[in-house]
């Protein structure tokens, strides 16, 4: 039996149910049904086990976590255990009564997704009418209760030029932080890659917009920025390193090293109904397989950054090369690095295909705009 340092944070994907249908959603293509979701007792046990291990943060996510009526109870339990609680939400479900309950339960932070600053563009991405106005109302309710607010803005070819507007929106809504993140191509994002991929010119413009805003705003607004991997020369560390800082719990209670890990065939993902969190974290096949550096191919073993990027993303390696155990193909040392860049350039230069919206039914078929 091995003992690994405990994760810093646990992400509780309480449900895959969501009012929105964003085509870049990181949830898996095979969404969990309501009947498959872990019950309240299961989530409470998970929080207790996490606290016992030394985990510091509990992030309540989904889907849309505010669709779970037991969310206030779970937040209160996290608070009682000394876990920092963060809500990751679309802001269009639950409303002020639920927010009051969450505040009373001890919720400490809210992350609110924003699809676009253009109302029509926001509705088109979300597949949900009047989404921006509802998010504005929710943000105002969050700030009226004195809760810290972070705006999560996901970028792609259809909204990349509106980064300055997104930053202005964060200021208007009195957010303390904004995360401006290009789409990461896993889950539904991978399925919609050709519809979402920005051009290199768009990427450079977003970099310039963020750097300009940082200079102008100083400490008035914290701005986090995540670039798209496909134009990179070096990979990003997956969740701070596979099985090192982060653990993800699916609605079914499966324990995952990252939210996309289930795409890797051949790995066994243990469930909390059958095994303890600590045992899974320390000894579970899925966590041990790519933890550390022993698994790395020779080209990674000799790299001075091997304990910085940890070989990059295993799910992306599988998606682009067919082998989860090879180096991330966005790395310039990869034999298919140029092919990855060429794919991005070709897709971004081609007409964008229709979105495949995130829906539990008929996930493999291209769908019409749900707003039409």
Curated annotation (Swiss-Prot):
Cofactor note: Binds 1 [4Fe-4S] cluster. The cluster is coordinated with 3 cysteines and an exchangeable S-adenosyl-L-methionine.
CDD domains registered for this protein in UniProt: Radical_SAM (cd01335), SPASM_PqqE (cd21119)
Gene Ontology terms for molecular function: 4 iron, 4 sulfur cluster binding; cyclase activity; iron ion binding; oxidoreductase activity; S-adenosyl-L-methionine binding
EC number: 1.21.98.4
Keywords, alphabetical: 4Fe-4S, Iron, Iron-sulfur, Metal-binding, Oxidoreductase, PQQ biosynthesis, S-adenosyl-L-methionine
Cofactor(s) annotated in UniProt: [4Fe-4S] cluster
Pathway: Cofactor biosynthesis; pyrroloquinoline quinone biosynthesis
Chain spans, region Disordered: 342-372
UniProt cross-references to SUPFAM superfamilies, sorted A to Z: Radical SAM enzymes (SSF102114)
NCBIfam families recorded: PQQ_syn_pqqE (TIGR02109), rSAM_more_4Fe4S (TIGR04085)
Record text on subunit structure and interactions: Interacts with PqqD. The interaction is necessary for activity of PqqE.
Name the UniProt record assigns to this protein: PqqA peptide cyclase
Organism whose genome encodes this protein: Xanthomonas euvesicatoria pv. vesicatoria (strain 85-10) (Xanthomonas campestris pv. vesicatoria)
Native organism taxonomy: Bacteria, Pseudomonadati, Pseudomonadota, Gammaproteobacteria, Lysobacterales
Gene: pqqE
């Amino acid at each position: 039996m091995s003992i690994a340092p405990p994760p810093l944070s646990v992400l509780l994907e309480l449900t895959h149910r969501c009012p929105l249908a964003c085509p870049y959603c990181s949830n898996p293509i095979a969404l969990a049904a309501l009947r498959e979701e872990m019950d309240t007792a299961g989530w409470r046990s998970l929080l207790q086990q996490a606290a016992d291990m030394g985990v510091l943060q509990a992030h309540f996510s989904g889907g849309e976590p505010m669709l779970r009526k037991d969310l206030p109870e779970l937040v209160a339990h996290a608070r009682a255990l000394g876990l920092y609680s963060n809500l990751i939400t679309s802001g269009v479900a639950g409303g002020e009564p639920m927010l009051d309950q969450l505040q009373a339960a001890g919720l400490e932070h809210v992350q609110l997704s924003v699809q676009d600053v253009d109302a029509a563009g926001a509705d088109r991405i979300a597949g949900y009418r009047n989404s921006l106005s509802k998010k504005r109302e929710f943000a105002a309710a969050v700030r009226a209760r004195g809760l810290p607010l972070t705006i999560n803005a996901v970028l792609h070819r259809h909204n990349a030029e509106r980064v300055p507007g997104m930053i202005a929106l964060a200021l208007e809504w009195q957010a303390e932080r904004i995360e401006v993140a290009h789409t990461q191509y896993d889950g539904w994002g991978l399925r919609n890659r050709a519809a979402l991929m920005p051009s290199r010119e768009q990427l450079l413009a977003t970099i310039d917009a963020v750097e300009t805003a940082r200079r102008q705003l100083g400490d008035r607004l914290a701005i986090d920025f995540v670039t798209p991997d496909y134009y990179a020369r070096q990979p990003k560390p997956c969740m701070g390193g596979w099985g090192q800082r982060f653990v993800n719990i699916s609605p079914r209670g499966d324990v995952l090293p990252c939210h996309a890990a289930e795409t890797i065939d051949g790995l066994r993902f243990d469930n909390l109904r059958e095994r303890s969190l600590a045992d899974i974290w320390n000894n579970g096949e899925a966590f041990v397989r790519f933890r550390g550096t022993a698994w790395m191919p020779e080209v990674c073993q000799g790299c001075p950054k091997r304990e910085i990027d940890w070989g990059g993303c295993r799910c992306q390696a599988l998606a682009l090369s067919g082998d989860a155990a090879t180096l991330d193909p966005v790395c310039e040392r990869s034999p298919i690095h140029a092919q990855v860049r060429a794919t991005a350039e070709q897709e971004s230069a081609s007409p964008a295909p229709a979105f495949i919206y995130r829906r539990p039914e008929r996930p493999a078929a291209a769908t019409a705009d749900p707003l039409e």
